Amino acid sequence: MNLALMKMWFALGSMGLMFLAVASIYLSRFKCQNRFLKIAISSFAYMCMLISGIIVFVVVFSGPVNE
């Protein structure tokens, strides 16, 4: 697998983490009644969003692949 395909899969995984973060925030805000569980789920969601943002930043600013 070449570098361009690896960057594509990292970007796709980052989008998956963003989707997981959105679903977790929805779950924590509208479906959970337990306060501790709300905090735990929303913390998980914000960590997913932070990690996905870092991955996207690295993929985008690493530049195009020379082939």
Swiss-Prot record:
GO cellular component entries: plasma membrane
Keywords: Cell membrane, Membrane, Transmembrane, Transmembrane helix
InterPro entries: DUF2768 (IPR020076)
Membrane topology: Multi-pass membrane protein
Entry keyword Ubl conjugation: no
Domain of life of the native organism: Bacteria
Localisation: Cell membrane
Positions of transmembrane segments: 8-28, 41-61
UniProt-recorded name of the protein: Uncharacterized protein YphE
Organism: Bacillus subtilis (strain 168)
Organismal lineage: Bacteria, Bacillati, Bacillota, Bacilli, Bacillales
The encoding gene: yphE
